[in-house]
């Protein structure tokens, strides 16, 4: 296995232009494929998850043209649901943002589709989405374990009606159903069971759907009303915002040891993860907001005790930033860390302890108490891009850190370590 040793960084300073958002890129690609008209997407993320979505769209008969640097994509929309005459086998890697929305969208049309992925994908739940789709008339069979991929969709259309989506595990189940529902034969009412996690990701979905001509009403995120028999219409040009989750590593670095500006997102961003900057500010960092940038500057950091359900991906970065704060930090209401690319709660606790950190791992929380002196460690990354990027921040201390399998960042940020080096000054 490859590893990368990061030597201590004395200071960070500079500006980072963020790659496109993974969440926005894959949602926009799917809607562009279903829409009437041609859509030009700019600042598209070039990463594994996006490549899996593009490969699937090719198999589904969608024509598109990708620029040489793969950040601009012109999609010729089908103007209808997907339809194939022969069975199609889609390999979606570990891309939840492709697996869940495609599972729902494929039910709208006709044909037989097998959806599978990497071994970890077979451990990531999809049962709550499948249950809801079946209520709306979908024909879906599991191939191995009930409630998990791989699965087969025998598409015969969705009729809508009253459906129930459990919102307590992942917001992607609701996102997937919301994007499919306007093209169902009838109107749909989606009733949310349990507490809806990661609400800001639903706001991203609703915002992008609106850009493609579909407006959805909801009653305080408990009940969603969607008119059926609608069509998505291309907005023409669609700019993908910079990835706010990816911004978190550079903003944290600035808060810990210098001053860093990220561009491509700003105070009007549709992504909830920009509120990561508010957490840094509560910890003592100095934050400046612009229309197209966020800047974080070093301040004396202190621990916090916060519910971070609204920023689950960026909250991982707080767990490592906490090593540079005075006192303990508790991150709460993050059960859905356990159903991400790996069981992130267990993985973060395990790797933090290697550094000599006192960690309490609960069912849905983690408490981190920094030691007086960190220890050098080899960090295992569990094929999880965010673990690799989070733990790179340990190099802002007076010790080196070794990241195993650094290439796993290709899921969302292939040149992350180059970008980090560009704003880093060695000790």
Curated annotation (Swiss-Prot):
CC per GO annotation: cytoplasm
Active site residues per record: 313 (proton acceptor)
Residues bound to 3-phosphoshikimate: 22-23, 27, 170-172, 198, 313, 336, 340
Top-rank taxon: Bacteria
GO biological process: amino acid biosynthetic process; aromatic amino acid family biosynthetic process; chorismate biosynthetic process
GO molecular function: 3-phosphoshikimate 1-carboxyvinyltransferase activity
Pathway noted in the entry: Metabolic intermediate biosynthesis; chorismate biosynthesis; chorismate from D-erythrose 4-phosphate and phosphoenolpyruvate: step 6/7
Listed EC numbers: 2.5.1.19
Pfam families cross-referenced by the UniProt entry: EPSP_synthase
InterPro entries: Enolpyruvate_Tfrase_dom, Enolpyruvate_Tfrase_sf, EPSP_synthase, EPSP_synthase_CS, RNA3'P_cycl/enolpyr_Trfase_a/b
Main location class: cytoplasm
Family: Belongs to the EPSP synthase family.
Functional description taken from the UniProt entry: Catalyzes the transfer of the enolpyruvyl moiety of phosphoenolpyruvate (PEP) to the 5-hydroxyl of shikimate-3-phosphate (S3P) to produce enolpyruvyl shikimate-3-phosphate and inorganic phosphate.
Record text on subunit structure and interactions: Monomer.
Name of the protein in question: 3-phosphoshikimate 1-carboxyvinyltransferase
Native source species: Aeromonas salmonicida (strain A449)
